[in-house]
Structures are given as C-alpha cells and as structure tokens.
Swiss-Prot record:
Localization per record: Cytoplasm, Cytoskeleton, Stress fiber
PROSITE patterns, alphabetized: PH_DOMAIN
Description of how the protein assembles with itself and partners: Monomer and homomultimer. Interacts via its C-terminus with F-actin; probably involving AFAP1 multimers. Interacts with activated SRC SH3-SH2 domains. Interacts via its PH 1 domain with PRKCA, PRKCB and PRKCI.
Record's comment on post-translational modification: Phosphorylated on tyrosine residues.
Protein name: Actin filament-associated protein 1
Region of interest called Disordered, as start-end residue ranges on this chain: 46-90, 118-138, 252-318, 511-550, 657-731
Ranges spanned by the short sequence motif SH3-binding, renumbered to the chain: 70-73
Coiled coil location: 558-649
C-alpha cells in the first residue's frame, strides 16, 4: 500500500509538467486530495503501531525520519468559475494570454455593452483610454479551453473580426509558424480561415472619436482585407511584433516587394494618414493604399472620420447598417463613366473578358482587359474604378501550359520570372488571349511555334488559328486606322511583328525581278517610296517596327489588280499541273485495270485468279479516289478562275468593276492575261501618291470605267460533267 502511494505521488508530480485538459486537471486534483487524506490518516496510524510493537520486543534501532512530502499544487480555494447555465452574452470577450511551459492558459475576460457590439463600429467605450476599464484575469477550466488549438502557438486571443456589412464576430485567432488561424470556436478542430502571413501587409488603425475599436488590417494581394479588433494599443503592438517575427522566420526566398516593412509595426499617425489621402486618389471600399510599406486607410473611411457626427446615440447603429446596405445595392444601378466602359462591344476582337487567375496557390475569376499595353485585372466587371493589379506587357513572354489539370493555361514571363498565370474557359478564348498578348508584348513569335503540351492536336490547331487571326487583327488596328480593313480569311500573314494591313502587300518572291523603275515624262525615275520623314511618322504613329524582311512592300490600294492576279495566276497554274498529273495517273490506272480484266479472263479457274481479282479491287478503289480528287480539283479550279476574272475586273473587296486594259471582253487564257498585266501601266511597284498612275479605287477611274459585259464560265457545266462521269463509271 505504501509503495502504491509513493508511485501515485510521483505520477502526479510528473503530470504537473504536462499540458492537460480541464477534465484531466479536475481528476488530478481529486486524486491529489484523496492521496493527502490517506497519508494524513492511515499512514501515521500504521507508523505508530509498528513503533509500539518493536519497543515491546526489541530495543528500537535508530531510525531515519521520513522525508516530508512536498505538497503538490492545488487550485485556489475559490475554485474554478461555474459554467454558465445560459449562453454567453453577446458582449462576452476573452483574450488568451501567450502560453509558457507548465502553465495553464489564462484568458482576459471583459463584458461590454451587447447593444454596442451589434452591427457597427461603436463597441469599445471611452473608459479604456482613460484607464477606467478593468481587466479581470482568471484561469479557464471549462471545455472551451482546448489545448490542442493553442499548442505551439506564438500568440493567441479571442478577437473580433469585421464582417462585410460592418458587423463583428468573435473568433479565436492563433498564430502558428507563419500562418494566422481563425477558429469560430475553441471546440473546432479545423480553422474557419487560414491566412499565410508571407506577402501580407498589416496596419494598425488607432481608435478615435468615430472608431470605437483599435483595428488591425491585414491585406493580402488578390483577397479582401481582414480587419481584427484588439482591446488596446499595447495588444496591437504585441500582435504586430509577433507577426513581424513570424514573417521573418519564413524559410525560402522572400520577395522584397511583399515583405512587411519595419515601419508596419509602428502605428500610423492620423495627421500623416490625412496628408497622404489628400494627395492620393482613394481606392475602393475595403482596399488599402500601400505607400512605403505602410498601408493607409481608404478614402471613404477617412472621409467618414472627418465628417462630424450629428448624434452619438446607440440607436443609430441600425441606421448606419441600413445606409451601407442601400449603398451596396445601388452600386449596380450607377452608370459607368466613359473611362470605365470597356470597348468589347465596339471591337471585332474584344480585348477583355473573364479569366481564372492563379494567386497564392488559389484560382480566382477576374475580369481582365488590355489597355495601353497593360493587362489590368479587376475584381468584377462592374467595378472598373479600381484594379487588383496592372501588369505592363512590353517585354513579357507568353508561354502556354502549366499542368495536365489545367490544360488551357498560359503564363506571362518577364526575364524568366513568372508574372501571371491565366486560364481560359475554351480553346477559342485561349487563342484569342494568346494573340492579344503576343501583339501587345511586341513579340515576334509565331503562335504555331509555341509548345502546347497539355492539349490535343485538334484543340491546339484551333488555338493556333484563333491566335493568328487575333494577332493579325491587333497589328492591323495598331498600324492603320482605315475603316476598309481586309477580312481575316488569310489568317496569320506576318509573324515577324509587322501587320499585313490594307495597304501593305509583299512583292512576288520578295523583290521585283527583270523590271526597271518607271520613268516620268521628263525622263527622271519616279520615286518608289515616300520621303523618309513621312515614313518615320507613319511608323511612329502605328507603333510597329519595320524589319528587313518586309522592307520591300508597296501600297496595295494602287496595285490591287496586279497583286490579286499574280496570286491567283500562280494558284491556277499549280491546280492545272495537279489536274494534268491526275489525268495521267487516271489514264495509267484505266490501262492497268483493262489489262487485269483480260488476264483474269485468261486465267479463269487457276490459282492466280484470286490474286488478280484482289489487285483489280485495289485498282478500282484507287480509281474512285483519284476521280473524287479530280472532281474537287475541277471545282476549285473553277472558283480560282472566277476570282481571277473578278480581280482583273477591279477586285471584289472594294466592289469595283474595272475591265482589264486589253480591248477584248472574251475570256482570256492565263498566259494572255499575264502578258496583259505585264504591259499594263498598273503593273509597276510605284508607291508615289503624286507622280504615279491613278489608283484603281480613285473616283476618276470609277467615272470612266464601265461594268464588264463578259460572261463568266458556267460553273454548273463542270458540275454536270462531273456527275455524268460518276454515273458512267458507276454503271
């Protein structure tokens, strides 16, 4: 029995150095009391009885006195505070004191007016500043004091968090490692909110006549600010110090732009705030303005501070909340100004839209738009007064792909560093944004040369096609503001960064061969280009660099006929060659088929008949395939011939009907047309506006010209012949 008592006493002493819950501590206190009672009653009786028995039998040997048992720690006589029978009042407020080894958690409890804690800024009374408010410290032994939540915490307290409409809610705020954990209750095992402190800026807003709380505003890029209320200036400084120490202990590289500055731990002076806000444009509600590392209050909050309040009564709390809700509801009814309106409805290729943006390892949907070579991210389409971030695009690099989970993702890099990670909703949207960003960054990269690792071939082809068309359109709009822009059917024309717009078409083979510059009436050569000063003005106005690859370009408006005709003639010649090759191949296949049929008749009933029949089937399949190719080729050739005739008649784009200067209205062969073009005065690469021939779209030529009376070749005739040929082969 004595051995059990000794071991039990040692066990209770060991428990004094451990973290225990309230239930275990109560059981330990009960066991300690029982042990003390047993030692005081039975222990001494057994000792006296043994001493009397020994004195009667033998002389008593010298005995060592028992060591005194140190009295273990006992709770005070007052005992733990009783648990409340009803729910805690609304103004009940607890602050957890930082723990030290071997101590139970202590909480500072204050009761405030529950009406003032409702839904406004008015809660803390003025007694606190004057030193009238008293804090009562007690040890919290009820079940709410969960030791697992505050274990290894640098600081913890019950703080008030400001909600969206100005209301306040009590949270248990704990800083562990480099994170701020907020629990709705100390009984919860999972935090309601987890905020990494790396990259955050924190501001202490002191209490004044309007603000009844000492506030800490924690702002992180891309998220709403977190506003916490503390009890005093000393507590605010303590939290600022702990947050700074927690951030300085972060492992890994730290971005100097996002690191909390030393001045963040110093309270901001009210006079300095007013001075800064008067010189700066105020930001949106809830967003702070960061200057020199110190986050200042927004303009609307400061304006509220300056306005003298008509009444300080507590009954105005509900009115203030009602006004806030009315303002928020009326935000959508306000007409945006011309600066805020996006031009997506007026542009053929909108440079704005919703994208998913990766920020702090979380995807958020943001309204993105491109303006003045900057990518501007807004929180919502309706809120264009303020922006979350503005990224200059000049000098950036566009790289598609991130991982297999997000195949429609593309990134912006500057000097190898990741600037933004964006995700589109579809392949067309991704191609459109890649084309826009390539044009705005001034990149010379072909969208087809980029690596699309996480999408299939069909989707990547769609992305590339859309990106090329968007890139071409953006560069056309940047170079020329002419309303008569050509269509985008030709796709991506110049990946070198210079747009192929209405008046710029490269010469055939990049240069004019075997042609001399035209001479004027006085024998002097005509200038082929405008003066260099005018050219520089055009280039500076367009904002596009001229490279050597497209240096030899001439004005399309004056030589539209030649440019279209040469392109169509080369295509017609290519189609005629393919048609001739198909004819020869078909003739060869028919001859082989005829020989095979004769061989099958000769070898009827022999073993070789099966092999010959298989070969005949293959030949017939190839014949059908070649026939289909020939029909499609005939149709394409007919379209090219019609387009060539329209080009010689003045071009379909401007709606002109100018006949070629040949003196005949009959259909011409490609060779004769080519000779006509060579001898015509419009075939020169003259780009002078004053000394060259009149352009084809001038009013003088339009008045003199007459509509062409020649009839185009009948397209239906070719289709009829093709059908007859198919019916003939089918029978």
């Amino acid at each position: 029995m004595e051995e059990l008592i000794v071991e039990l006493r040692l066990f209770l002493e060991l428990l004094d150095h451990e973290y225990l819950t309230s239930t275990v501590r109560e059981k330990k206190a009960v066991l300690t009391n029982i042990l003390l009672r047993m030692q005081s009653s039975k222990g001494f009786e057994v000792k006296d009885h043994a001493q009397k028995a020994e004195t009667n039998n033998l002389p008593a040997p010298p005995q060592m006195p028992l060591p005194e048992i140190p009295q273990p720690w006992l709770p005070p006589d007052s005992g733990p505070p009783p648990l409340p029978t009803s729910s805690l009042p609304e103004g009940y407020y607890e602050e957890a004191v930082p723990l030290s080894p071997g101590k139970a958690p202590e909480y500072i409890t204050s009761n405030y007016d529950s009406e003032a804690m409702g839904s406004s800024y008015e809660s803390y009374d003025e007694e606190e500043e004057d030193g009238k408010g008293k804090k009562t410290q007690h040890q919290c032994h009820h079940e709410e004091a969960s030791m697992d939540l505050v274990k290894d915490a640098k600081i913890c307290a019950f703080l008030l968090r400001k909600k969206r409409f100005g209301q306040w809610t009590k949270l248990l705020c704990v800083i562990k490692d480099t994170k701020l954990l907020c629990y709705k209750s100390s009984k919860d095992q999972q935090p309601q909110m987890e905020l990494p402190l790396q990259g955050c800026s924190i501001t202490y807003i002191p209490r004044d006549s309007k603000k009844k709380k000492h506030e800490l505003k924690i702002t992180q890029q891309g998220t709403d600010p977190l506003v916490l209320a503390v009890q005093s200036k000393e507590q605010a400084e303590q939290w600022l110090k702990v947050i700074k120490e927690a951030y300085s202990g972060c492992s890994g590289p730290v971005d100097p732009e996002c690191s909390p500055p030393p001045s963040a731990s110093v309270p901001v002076n009210k006079a300095e705030l007013e001075k800064k806000l008067s010189s700066e444009r105020p930001s949106s509600d809830g967003e702070g303005v960061v200057e020199n590392g110190v986050t200042t209050c927004n303009g609307k909050e400061q304006a509220k501070r300056k306005k003298p309040s008509k009444s300080e009564a507590k009954g105005t709390v509900s009115k203030v909340t009602g006004k806030k809700i009315t303002k928020i509801i009326g935000l959508g009814k306000k007409k945006p100004s011309t600066d805020e309106q996006t031009s997506s409805a007026e542009e053929d290729v909108p440079t704005c839209g919703y994208l998913n943006v990766l920020s702090n390892s979380r995807w958020r949907e943001r309204w993105c738009r491109v303006k003045d070579s900057k990518l501007i991210l807004h929180k919502d389409r309706a809120d264009l007064k303020t922006h979350i971030v503005s990224i200059p695009l000049r000098g950036c690099e566009v790289i598609p792909g991130l991982d297999s989970k997000h195949p429609l993702t593309f990134r912006l890099l500057r000097n190898g560093q990741e600037v933004a990670v964006l995700e589109a909703s579809s392949s067309e949207d991704m191609g459109r944004w890649i084309g826009i960003l390539l044009a705005e960054t001034g990149s010379s990269t072909d969208p087809g040369a980029l690596h699309y690792d996480y999408i299939d071939v069909e989707m990547s082809a769609n992305v590339i096609q859309t990106a090329k068309q968007t890139f071409c359109f953006m560069n056309r709009r940047a170079v020329s503001t002419s309303p008569y822009l050509g269509s985008l059917s030709n796709g991506y024309a110049h990946p070198s960064g210079t747009a192929l717009h209405y008046d710029d078409v490269p010469c055939v083979n990049g240069s004019l061969k075997n042609k001399k510059p035209p001479a004027s009436s006085n024998g002097l050569p005509v200038k082929g280009r405008a003066p260099s000063s005018q050219q520089k003005k055009v280039e500076s106005a367009g904002g596009v660099k001229r490279t050597a690859s497209n240096a030899e370009q001439y004005k399309y408006g004056k030589n539209r006929v030649e440019a279209d005709a040469k392109r169509l003639q080369s295509k017609e010649e290519e189609l005629l060659k393919r048609k001739e090759a198909l004819r020869n191949r078909l003739a060869q296949l028919r001859k082989e088929r005829k020989d095979l049929r004769a061989a099958i008749e000769v070898n009827a009933g022999r073993k070789t008949q099966v092999a010959l029949e298989d070969k005949l089937k293959r030949l017939e399949e190839e014949c059908k395939q070649r026939e289909a190719e020939r029909v499609s080729l005939e149709l394409e050739l007919t379209e090219v011939k019609e387009s060539l005739k329209k080009a010689l008649a003045g071009g379909v784009t401007l709606g002109l009907a100018i006949e070629p200067k040949s003196g005949t209205s009959s259909p011409q062969s490609p060779v004769f047309r080519h000779r006509t073009l060579e001898n015509s005065p419009i075939s020169s690469c003259d780009t002078s506006d004053a000394e060259g021939p009149l352009p084809v779209n001038s009013a003088a030529v339009l008045k003199k010209s007459q509509p062409s009376s020649s009839s185009s070749p009948c397209r239906g005739h070719v289709l009829q012949k093709a059908r007859e040929w198919e019916l003939k082969n089918g029978t």
